[in-house]
C-alpha cells in the first residue's frame, strides 16, 4: 500500500512562526509521531511526504533512518493542491493510496492497516468517529436554525483511502469545475461516489491548537504507561 502524508501546513492557529508539525510534542516533533505509526504499519510499503520547501531539511532529518522507501514531494498552496501533487508523484504501479494528515500524530498502525485492508477490498474509506456532542446549525447572526440527528453524524479523520485512478479522476473533475474541498471524501460526495466509514478512536485528533498539543501529550504519556 502507498501512503501520502500531507505535511504542508502552517502554525498560524498555534500562534507559531513555523509548521505546526515541527513543533515539539513529548520531546519530539509532532510529525515524528505520525511517521512512527506509518513505519509500524505492515501494510505500508511506500511513503510520500508532501511538504513545503522551507521545511524539507528538517523533515528529511526525521526520515534519516526510515525503514521504508520515502519520497519528498513539494506541496501546493492548499491541501487539495498538495494531494494532487502527491498523486502525480506516486509510482506507476500504485493501485491504491491512503492519504493521511501529518497533524494526526496519534493514529495507530492498527488503524492504518484496517484502512489499507478495506481499500484493497474495493471500498473508498475514511477513518471517523461518531459525534457525541449535540450539533447545531447556526446562521450568520448566531441564531440556531436546526439540530441534525446525531445518530447520522460522524467526525471525519484520516487515513482516507481510495483507488488511485478514481481519485485522480475526481481531482481532475474538481479542477475543471472549480471545486474546493477540505478532504478527499468530500470530493467523492460531490461526485456521488460512495465512501465507507471505519470507526476510529476519538484519540486520533488533528493537532491544530495549543490545547490539542496538551491533549496529545497526555495520550502519549498514557500509552507509554
Swiss-Prot record:
Return the Pfam families for the record.
IspD
Query: Which CDD domains does the UniProt record give?
Result: CDP-ME_synthetase
GO-annotated biological processes: isopentenyl diphosphate biosynthetic process, methylerythritol 4-phosphate pathway
Annotated gene: ispD
Recorded protein name is 2-C-methyl-D-erythritol 4-phosphate cytidylyltransferase
Q: Which family is it part of?
A: Belongs to the IspD/TarI cytidylyltransferase family. IspD subfamily.
Instruction: Tell me the PANTHER family matching this sequence.
Output: 2-C-METHYL-D-ERYTHRITOL 4-PHOSPHATE CYTIDYLYLTRANSFERASE, CHLOROPLASTIC
Q: Which reaction does it catalyse?
A: 2-C-methyl-D-erythritol 4-phosphate + CTP + H(+) = 4-CDP-2-C-methyl-D-erythritol + diphosphate
Q: Keywords in UniProt for this one?
A: Isoprene biosynthesis, Nucleotidyltransferase, Transferase
UniProt organism field: Prochlorococcus marinus (strain MIT 9313)
Q: What is its EC number?
A: 2.7.7.60
Q: Name one GO molecular function term.
A: 2-C-methyl-D-erythritol 4-phosphate cytidylyltransferase activity
Amino acid at each position: 500500500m502507498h501512503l501520502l502524508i500531507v505535511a504542508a501546513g502552517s502554525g498560524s492557529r498555534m500562534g507559531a512562526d513555523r509548521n505546526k508539525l515541527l513543533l515539539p510534542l513529548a520531546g519530539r516533533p509532532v510529525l515524528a509521531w505520525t511517521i512512527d505509526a506509518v513505519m509500524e504499519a505492515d501494510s505500508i510499503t511506500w511513503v510520500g511526504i508532501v511538504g513545503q520547501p522551507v521545511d524539507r531539511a528538517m523533515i528529511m532529518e526525521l526520515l534519516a533512518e526510515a525503514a521504508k522507501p520515502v519520497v519528498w514531494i513539494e506541496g501546493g498552496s492548499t491541501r487539495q493542491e498538495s494531494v494532487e501533487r502527491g498523486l502525480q508523484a506516486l509510482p506507476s504501479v500504485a493501485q491504491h493510496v491512503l492519504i493521511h494528515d501529518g497533524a494526526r500524530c496519534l493514529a495507530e498502525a492498527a488503524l492504518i492497516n484496517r484502512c489499507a485492508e478495506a481499500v484493497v477490498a474495493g471500498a473508498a474509506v475514511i477513518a471517523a468517529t461518531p459525534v457525541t456532542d449535540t450539533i447545531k446549525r447556526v446562521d450568520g447572526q448566531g441564531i440556531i436554525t436546526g439540530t441534525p440527528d446525531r445518530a447520522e453524524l460522524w467526525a471525519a479523520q484520516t487515513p482516507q483511502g481510495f483507488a488511485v485512478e478514481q481519485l485522480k479522476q475526481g481531482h481532475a473533475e474538481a479542477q475543471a469545475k472549480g471545486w474546493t474541498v477540505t478532504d478527499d471524501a468530500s470530493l467523492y460526495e460531490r461526485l456521488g461516489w460512495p465512501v465507507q466509514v471505519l470507526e476510529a478512536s476519538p484519540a486520533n485528533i488533528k493537532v491544530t491548537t495549543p490545547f490539542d498539543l496538551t491533549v496529545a501529550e497526555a495520550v502519549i504519556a498514557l500509552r507509554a504507561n
